[in-house]
């Protein structure tokens, strides 16, 4: 009888230990450094007085040319049930407000920011990841499938080496800074002309210093991206909608956050708010 009870107890403990919480949901209305990992030159952004903090997560420092950095959520996040490439990827969605602000004494922008999903926390600062590499990869690692990198870039410098369509675009990247698909930055609004509904595209300038909001969703092997000025609601029509199978890209757990870099064209890259949610269930 005692042995029977012991077996039941061991089984109960085993079941408890195997049950893990996979779903993740968080929201930052502003940043104070809590639950964040800072890599490279990433920091809590300074306020205009130069002493206090603005509440932003900053990827670069406008007084340091060629600076770049990453700001990541502290905990690894489940992205699929196992590392097997056949495992389906959990749906996820994220939204954030950001601004890219050139330094007044040097109005030429460069280079941009990206929402990222990466396999590890890269504590070793890579000096070669600056400029058009957006703090993500370097000339040697760009395009390597072992990067296990997913990113949506907001690029304000046309680097023809990477096939950039212009100096003001949004792109979806897999293991590389060469975008799988990209569109000029802007948003769609629906208008009515002569009794007919029509879509009108309104371009925005990412490096204007204005606040913009982005929404990114992944579901059923499809990436969907919306962009609009921060004071507007999410547009009904997305900027980008493309088929992307992340099952061979993401691992069972990944880190998520932002990266950014600049060259001689000094600018600030600030994230002002951020929410993230995946649809994983308890295992």
UniProtKB/Swiss-Prot annotation:
A Pfam family assignment: Lectin_legB
InterPro entries named in the record: ConA-like_dom_sf (IPR013320), L-lectin (IPR016363), Legume_lectin_dom (IPR001220), Leguminous_Lectin (IPR050258)
Compartments where located: Secreted, Extracellular space, Apoplast
Renumbered residue ranges of the record's region Legume-lectin like: 24-277
Glycosylation sites: 84, 138
GO cellular component: apoplast; nucleus
Signal sequence, start to end: 1-23
Keywords assigned by UniProt, alphabetized: Apoplast, Glycoprotein, Lectin, Phosphoprotein, Secreted, Signal
UniProt modified residues of type Phosphoserine: 247
Family: Belongs to the leguminous lectin family.
Protein's name in the database: Lectin-like protein At1g53080
